[in-house]
């Protein structure tokens, strides 16, 4: 390869590394906004063309607003949630599309209302599709397959000393 | 340095970044296949020269098949497992060898059989050696030192609503 071609190849590969990092940060922002219940900011992580399937594909949505409205209604302030993403496997499929696998651990705690003291723990394998529009990466598709999910009653004597949603 | 030398240095450094990312993805695939009980796919992450020590080095294996057979037998369908890897420290030792440290959190749930309702939680520091063969990274050595491990009886009233292994 000529020097010119080698520099061009470097530029392309460095762009891919930057895209992988940007996608990891996009997902970090998604989890942070989800558990921080920052719905408007969460919407900015979703592609206008989003197709989302939740709960093993039973629930499907077709716009950022539909997704955030669903999340907002299904994760009210009475519910503390933690979605912890691990060991991503990101593949750049083209200059504007990518695929990502994430190992998810999740934890839900109901602090009030009908489900007070209910706890839910689980794990899942996420598979996402991402799309780059005008230099910015967005979540285009997200869905997961549960490893397991368990529901239980928490000991009421557990004292929640801090809760950002109350 | 000449332009040629500068391009060469860039190529070398970018290759190291790509190798670090590839190793992180390799480990993500290993954990995903382990907990998804996808033994054939797990085998593809292991080097033909693998030397593995589990349980603080007491168990040692010398081929991918030996490792996956052991894992398959010791982690049957009655056992939900979650191995969550955190904060990797990857060092590229040479063009074809690397070392990786991982902070592991693990959770095991026995859903049936002799150990029904047993739970095991723990944490460990993993130290791995990786090997690159024909451009592909593999786990060459993996072993860990336990931070702690705890065994307990889970409340039978905990309701497992989803389990990919059942």
From Swiss-Prot, chains A, B:
It comes from the Bacteria. Its EC number is 4.2.1.106. GO terms for biological process: bile acid biosynthetic process; bile acid catabolic process; lipid catabolic process. Induction: Induced by bile acids such as cholate. GO terms for cellular component: cytoplasm. Pathway: Lipid metabolism; bile acid biosynthesis. InterPro entries: NTF2-like_dom_sf, SnoaL-like. One of its GO terms (molecular function) is bile-acid 7alpha-dehydratase activity. SUPFAM superfamilies: NTF2-like. Keywords: Bile acid catabolism, Lipid degradation, Lipid metabolism, Lyase, Steroid metabolism. It catalyses: 7alpha,12alpha-dihydroxy-3-oxochol-4-en-24-oyl-CoA = 12alpha-hydroxy-3-oxochola-4,6-dien-24-oyl-CoA + H2O; 7alpha-hydroxy-3-oxochol-4-en-24-oyl-CoA = 3-oxochol-4,6-dien-24-oyl-CoA + H2O; 7alpha,12alpha-dihydroxy-3-oxochol-4-en-24-oate = 12alpha-hydroxy-3-oxochola-4,6-dien-24-oate + H2O; 7alpha-hydroxy-3-oxochol-4-en-24-oate = 3-oxochola-4,6-dien-24-oate + H2O. Functions in the bile acid 7alpha-dehydroxylation pathway, which forms secondary bile acids via the 7alpha-dehydroxylation of primary bile acids, and is carried out by intestinal anaerobic bacteria. Catalyzes the dehydration step in this pathway, yielding a 3-oxo-Delta(4,6)-bile acid-CoA intermediate. Homodimer. This is Bile acid 7alpha-dehydratase. It comes from Clostridium scindens (strain JCM 10418 / VPI 12708).
